[in-house]
Amino acid sequence: MTKVKICGITTLEDALMAVEAGADALGFVFFEKSPRYIGPEAAARIIRELPPFVQVVGLFVDAELDFVNRTADTCGLDLVQLHGEESPAYCGLVRRRVMKAFRVRGPESLAALPDYKVSAYLLDAYSPASHGGTGERFDWEHAVAAKGEGRIVLAGGLDPDNVAQAVAKVAPYAVDVSSGVELSPGRKDREKVRRFVAEAKKLS
């Protein structure tokens, strides 16, 4: 069954609502330039209230390694998502399983995938202005081609109206959504989250 991650969680209300809808993982953005930014202490307070068996993911962009590892410990992160230009060596020093994000413009964007020995590869649309959460899509054929390298988490422009099509086309390990289920940056829409999870899992 396709896993679902709801990213950009900033409130306990949204976290519990996403879990109730059937989300497998929640993402917390520790990148201060993001409109979905949350501080480690605030995230930790939310995470402590979550039910068991929900995966907790922390998103970082070219952060100091010590900050990543300290935040992972403070929050009890299950997985670290690296969304910048982090090297394979850097990934190897993170004290959690790593999901490395690649911002896809074309096949050349994925040339470095084999260099990264990580738990999963997140494929997102390229934007010169933002590291994720843009609502932009990329050609899913690139995701299909990348599946031979390992687990693929599909992101970029997904929403309740197209996620079933994406799952049918790519058959990814998981799908990741942020802006596609929002009322405003950092606040989720209950009905969109419910529909997204249901649509993502209906073909499984």
Curated annotation (Swiss-Prot):
Keywords: Amino-acid biosynthesis, Aromatic amino acid biosynthesis, Isomerase, Tryptophan biosynthesis. It catalyses: N-(5-phospho-beta-D-ribosyl)anthranilate = 1-(2-carboxyphenylamino)-1-deoxy-D-ribulose 5-phosphate. Pathway: Amino-acid biosynthesis; L-tryptophan biosynthesis; L-tryptophan from chorismate: step 3/5. InterPro entries: Aldolase_TIM, PRAI_dom, RibuloseP-bd_barrel, TrpF_fam. SUPFAM superfamilies: Ribulose-phoshate binding barrel. CDD domains: PRAI. The keyword Isomerase applies. Pfam families: PRAI. Its EC number is 5.3.1.24. GO terms for biological process: L-tryptophan biosynthetic process. GO terms for molecular function: phosphoribosylanthranilate isomerase activity. Belongs to the TrpF family. This is N-(5'-phosphoribosyl)anthranilate isomerase. The lineage of its organism: Bacteria, Pseudomonadati, Thermodesulfobacteriota, Desulfuromonadia, Geobacterales.
